Amino acid sequence: MFSYCWSVRAFPLRKAPRGALSRAILPIVLAVLVAISSAHGAAGKRADNSGEVDTEHIFGFTEGSDIGEAGEKELEADSTGRFGKPGGSYNTVATALEAKYSFSDRFRLSANATVAYYDITGVNGIDDRRQAALQSVSFDARFRLFDREHAPFGLTLSVEPHRGFADEMSGEPADQYGAEFRVLADRELIPGRLFAAFNISYEPEQTRLRGSGETLRESTLGIGAALAMQVMPNVFIGAEARNLRHYDGLGLNGFGGQALYIGPTFYATFGARYFISAAWNVQVWGAVAGSSGALDLDNFERHLVKLRVGARF
C-alpha cells in the first residue's frame, strides 16, 4: 500500500531497518486483508449509501478528493498536537478555525486562522516557551479534476498560501510566508465499504525570526497513503502511512532529514451535518542527514495527533 523510494538526495542515506519497515507496512496490510475478508462477496455491488460518503476527512492526516456539492458551506475546527523531541519536554497544540464554501462541484475556497499553544522545556536547540500565539492565517483553493463517481478515481489539486506570525516548531515570533501544494487522489475499492487515498505535498516556506533577524528558507516534501473502511453506518476506521522529507532551501536544495509515520484513523458523522475525525501518527523510522540515528527528531516530532470537528450546511 505504501512504497518508500526517493532516488534524488543531497546526502547518502542508510537503509531503513527491515524491522522498522515491516512494522510500518504491517498495519495497512492487515487493514486491507480484514476489509476484503469482511466484505467478501460485496465487490461489484454498489451499496445504497456509497454515493453519500464524503472522503475528505475519513483518512486522517491524509485527505480525500471530495470538496462538497455546489453551494455547500462548512465550518471546521482542526487541532493538531505535536509531541516528543530529545532532551526535554516538547508539547504543542495548534487549532485552525476554517470556513469553506463550494462555488461549484469542482471549485472550493476556504479561509482559516490558526492559534497555537507551546509548552517547551529543556529541548535541544529550542528556547523554553510556555505561551499561546496566533500562528498563521491562510486560504485554500481546491480544484477537482476527476469525480470519483464518474472516473476510476477522484483527483483534486489544492493550493494553500499562508502568512505566519510564529515559528511552527519553536513558537518564536516570526514573519513567515509560504504555501502548500497538494495532489489528493482517492478510490472506492469496495463499493460503500473500503476507500483508499494517496497524497503528494510540497511546502516551501521563508521565515524571518524577529528576535535574531535570521532568515530561514526550507521546504517539505510529503507522500502518504491511507485506507478507511466503513465498519458500521457512518463510522470509518483505517490506517495511514506518511513519509515526510525536510530540505534546506525553497527548491528542495539540501536534504536535511526524513521521517516515516504510521497510525490509526477514525471518522464518524452525526445526522446529515456533523462529523468528527481523529488520527494518531507515530514516527517509526527516520534519519537526520549525516546521522546514524533511527529517528529524525530534529526536523519532526515523535507523535502527531489530529482531531477535527465540523458541520456542513
Where in this protein do the model-derived segments appear?
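Transmembrane beta-barrel domains of Gram-negative outer membranes and organellar outer membranes
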Residues: 41-313
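N-terminal secretory signal peptides that target proteins for export/translocation
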Residues: 1-22
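Bacterial N-terminal signal peptides
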Residues: 22-36
